[in-house]
UniProtKB/Swiss-Prot annotation:
Cellular component, GO annotation: cytosol
Pfam families: Chorismate_synt
Native organism: Burkholderia multivorans (strain ATCC 17616 / 249)
Annotated keywords: Amino-acid biosynthesis, Aromatic amino acid biosynthesis, FAD, Flavoprotein, FMN, Lyase, NADP
Protein family membership: Belongs to the chorismate synthase family.
Domain of life of the native organism: Bacteria
Chemical reaction(s) catalysed: 5-O-(1-carboxyvinyl)-3-phosphoshikimate = chorismate + phosphate
This protein's name: Chorismate synthase
Swiss-Prot/TrEMBL GO biological process terms: amino acid biosynthetic process; aromatic amino acid family biosynthetic process; chorismate biosynthetic process
GO molecular function terms listed in the Swiss-Prot or TrEMBL record: chorismate synthase activity; FMN binding
Cofactor(s), names only, from the UniProt record: FMNH2
Length: 366
């Protein structure tokens, strides 16, 4: 089966291509009775849309969302919700030079070898443009999680290239185009990106996402563990090459006496597990980090081959993000929210009536 759908009970199926007439998604399984307007979704899309600063692609897309179904008189009906976002600023002529060649680092070669046909315009189906519908669906998931359980899903940039971004306060995240939680470091990030763009090169980034207020019990062992589904969803984001839950790869150097989060009547002591044990949420913050590779489209000539297997030199034109990580924060937030709402509904379906005598301890003992 083709892999265009995410989720089990709350499913999202995306459609469209970068330079097609429109992109969008169909959400199935959204509970009825939730107030929902296009403005609720647009607010999240505006955080991701291109052309918002000199540090991202200058493709000008309003990303205005249309709700085609599943909402009546401002309330979800429980039927499929179709979201449509029209493409308005395609410039396909910029890709005429790669009709017969493959861009290094892109999905051109693999899509061609798998399907025997590819839409070369802006990467077609493999373009990060297709993350817009994910953010639209994520807005629906975020709203339901917040209103039903008080769950908040927030993210920020924790590193841009070799520059670490120390966390100061959540209030800074919405005040700069990098989603940096530290206002003092923004000038350094801007200078770094200006120099990078002048060199015609690109760089990667690290994004951290935190879900707070998640109840204990979400997750379906053994093959649909909460952290496993989170990792899969995050790896589905374009350019993501690594995922960490909690301490992640730092766990390798930690002793068991350090890594194991002790339990006390007052709460957990530490959260190295990232809010998940045995594939089930603990009630602590769920913490996720993703590593995003440098953008493959750069101005430097690159070696490649033609469809006939002959050597070729590829020069990439078009409008591209020198760091796709700059706009990735709302995408990562949306992916986490989509996994959480799916598991919330799955838990309710099987274990909604389960009660134990053990009190639910706090996420932190401090």
């Amino acid at each position: 089966m083709s892999g265009n759908t995410l989720g089990t009970l709350f499913t999202v199926t995306t459609f469209g291509e970068s330079h097609g007439p429109a992109i969008g998604c169909v959400i199935d399984g959204c509970p009825p009775g939730m107030a929902l307007t296009e403005a609720d979704i647009q607010a999240e899309l505006d955080r991701r849309k291109p052309g918002t600063s000199r540090h991202v692609t200058q493709r000008q897309e309003a990303d205005e969302v249309e709700i085609l179904s599943g909402v009546f008189e401002g309330v979800t009906t429980g039927t499929p919700i179709a979201l449509l976002i029209r493409n308005t600023d395609q410039r396909s002529k910029d890709y005429g030079n790669i009709v017969e060649t493959f861009r290094p680092g892109h999905a051109d070669y693999t899509y061609w070898q798998k399907y025997g046909v590819r839409d070369y315009r802006g990467g077609g189906r493999s373009s990060a443009r297709l993350t817009a519908p994910i953010v639209g669906a994520g807005a629906v998931a975020k709203k339901w999680l917040r209103e039903r359980f008080g769950v908040e899903v927030r993210g920020y940039m924790s590193a841009l290239g070799e520059i670490d971004v120390p966390f100061v306060d959540w209030s800074h995240v919405r005040e700069n185009p990098f989603f940096a939680p530290n206002a003092a470091i923004v000038p350094e990030l801007e200078a770094y990106m200006d120099a990078l763009r002048k060199d015609g090169d690109s760089i990667g980034a690290r994004i951290d996402v935190v879900a707070s207020g998640v109840p204990v019990g979400w997750g379906e062992p053994v093959f649909d563990r909460l952290d496993a589904d989170i990792a899969k969803a995050m790896m589905s984001i374009n350019a993501v090459k690594g995922v960490e839950i909690g301490a992640g790869f730092d766990s390798v150097a930690q002793r068991g006496s350090v890594h194991g989060d002790e339990l006390t009547p007052a709460g957990f002591v530490g959260n190295h597990a990232g809010g998940v044990l045995g594939g089930i949420s603990t009630g602590q913050d769920i913490t996720v980090s993703i590593a995003i590779k440098p953008t493959s489209s750069i101005r430097t000539p690159r070696r490649s081959i033609t469809k006939d297997g002959q050597p070729a030199t590829v020069e990439t034109f078009g409008r591209h993000d020198p760091c796709v990580g700059i706009r990735a924060t709302p995408i990562a937030e949306s992916m986490l929210a989509l996994v959480l709402i799916d598991h919330a509904l799955r838990h309710r379906a099987q274990c909604g009536d389960v009660e134990t005598q053990t009190p639910k301890i706090a996420g932190s003992a401090t």
